[in-house]
Amino acid sequence: MSVTGLPFDDFRTLLRDLPGPDPRALVAARERDAQLTKPPGALGRLEEIAFWLAAWTGRAPAVTRPLVAIFAGNHGVTKQGITPFPPSVTQQMVENFAAGGAAINQICVTYDLGLKVFDLALDYPTGDITEEPALSERDCAATMAFGMEAIAGGTDLLCIGEMGIGNTTIAAAIHYALYGGTAAEWVGPGTGSEGEMLKRKIAAVEKAAALHREHLSDPLEVLRRLGGREIAAMAGAILAARMERIPVIIDGYVATAAASILKAANPSALDHCLIGHVSAEPGHLKAIDKLGKTPLLALGMRLGEGTGAALAAGIVKAAAACHSGMATFESAGVTNKH
């Protein structure tokens, strides 16, 4: 990062000049697809996914080093009584990931996906967004930079997920700030908020948006004031993947909040991304619609942990395998249409 200027300056520069897809690789993928032993378009979105992989990786579609990156953070807003679980559960779940006992571990084993877990100062929750900014600009920028390291070990498909007690409140606040409407439209039960607790959750989002209202026209200010460390790190990871032309699968409502920040900063910022699934959290489909995306899966899930993105990675791997492994009409001796 630069040693001059404001902490966000480097990210504003990156967001202004994002690399695009490789048109030659896309053309080559389309030409091969036209020769495969199937009617045109018969594989539906699998074909679109293969083209997307080719365009962003600049090669024939292949997934050889898929990675799930989970970012874990804690939030000061939990003291407002908006969740039935204490913040200590975040650390406990990080330990569960390390021990191989979480749902995401089983999915990664099933689909042969790598897994990295990044815990982000769990003993130091962010500021309570109903009272103060979640992060300083310096801390937010540093956390984004930390998130960029998710791709350091090498990957050709990055799945973005998270863990953090209270972070569906944070996601709701971000989407409310970016897209308007009412707070109630964006707030859902998360890990089980209902009744009076759900009312407190809505009130917290309303209070936070009102407190920071004068600063919410800037997406990066939305991130630092209403976000959290895992949101900032996910935004950094998605951005780093773009700079290296690595395709990304985004998980649920909270991961989508990080994506929404980037989309607000540059309308093309998510062109290298797919939405893995639509979760049961009520605001998620609305947020996906705002991004102009279509999720790959709709399984009624609302766990987080990158689980929906990881399941979608199995579909992406299948798309690449079909594209590369299927015979052509000529090689199989199958008659093509006239």
From Swiss-Prot:
Q: Name one GO molecular function term.
A: nicotinate-nucleotide-dimethylbenzimidazole phosphoribosyltransferase activity
Please name the taxonomic classification of the source.
Answer: Bacteria, Pseudomonadati, Pseudomonadota, Alphaproteobacteria, Hyphomicrobiales
EC number(s): the record gives 2.4.2.21
* Catalytic-site annotation from UniProt: 305 (proton acceptor)
Per the UniProt record, one Pfam family is DBI_PRT
Query: Quick one: a GO biological-process term for this protein?
Result: cobalamin biosynthetic process
**What broad class of enzyme is this?**
transferase
User: Which terms are listed as keywords in the entry?
Assistant: Cobalamin biosynthesis, Glycosyltransferase, Transferase
Could you identify this protein by its name? Answer: Nicotinate-nucleotide--dimethylbenzimidazole phosphoribosyltransferase
Residues annotated as transmembrane: none
Which family does the entry's similarity section mention?
A: Belongs to the CobT family.
Concerning InterPro entries, the annotation shows: Nict_dMeBzImd_PRibTrfase, Nict_dMeBzImd_PRibTrfase_bact, Nict_dMeBzImd_PRibTrfase_N, Nict_dMeBzImd_PRibTrfase_sf
In terms of CDD domains, this protein maps to:
DMB-PRT_CobT
The keyword Transferase is annotated on this UniProt entry: yes
Pathway-wise, it operates in: Nucleoside biosynthesis; alpha-ribazole biosynthesis; alpha-ribazole from 5,6-dimethylbenzimidazole: step 1/2
Alphabetical list of PANTHER family matching this protein: NICOTINATE-NUCLEOTIDE--DIMETHYLBENZIMIDAZOLE PHOSPHORIBOSYLTRANSFERASE (PTHR43463:SF1)
What is the role of this chain? Catalyzes the synthesis of alpha-ribazole-5'-phosphate from nicotinate mononucleotide (NAMN) and 5,6-dimethylbenzimidazole (DMB).
- Reactions this protein catalyses: 5,6-dimethylbenzimidazole + nicotinate beta-D-ribonucleotide = alpha-ribazole 5'-phosphate + nicotinate + H(+)
